[in-house]
From Swiss-Prot:
Claim: Signal is one of the keywords in the record: no
Species per Swiss-Prot/TrEMBL record: Spinacia oleracea (Spinach)
Complexes and interactors: The 4 large subunits of the cytochrome b6-f complex are cytochrome b6, subunit IV (17 kDa polypeptide, PetD), cytochrome f and the Rieske protein, while the 4 small subunits are PetG, PetL, PetM and PetN. The complex functions as a dimer.
Gene: petG
Annotated transmembrane regions: 5-25
Keywords, comma-separated and alphabetical: Chloroplast, Electron transport, Membrane, Photosynthesis, Plastid, Thylakoid, Transmembrane, Transmembrane helix, Transport
GO cellular component: chloroplast thylakoid membrane; cytochrome b6f complex
Protein name per Swiss-Prot or TrEMBL: Cytochrome b6-f complex subunit 5
InterPro entries in the cross-refs: Cyt_6/f_cplx_su5, Cyt_6/f_cplx_su5_sf
Length: 37
């Protein structure tokens, strides 16, 4: 039961982590464009 619980937490954190990295990279990309302009 504990292994299944930890596995569920990992599966839940992976999409959140990927989404956070994507948003951070997107904001930095937009910020870079604004500085270039």
């Amino acid at each position: 039961m504990i292994e299944v619980f930890l596995f569920g937490i990992v599966l839940g954190l992976i999409p959140i982590t990927l989404a956070g990295l994507f948003v951070t990279a997107y904001l930095q990309y937009r910020r870079g464009d604004q500085l270039d302009l």
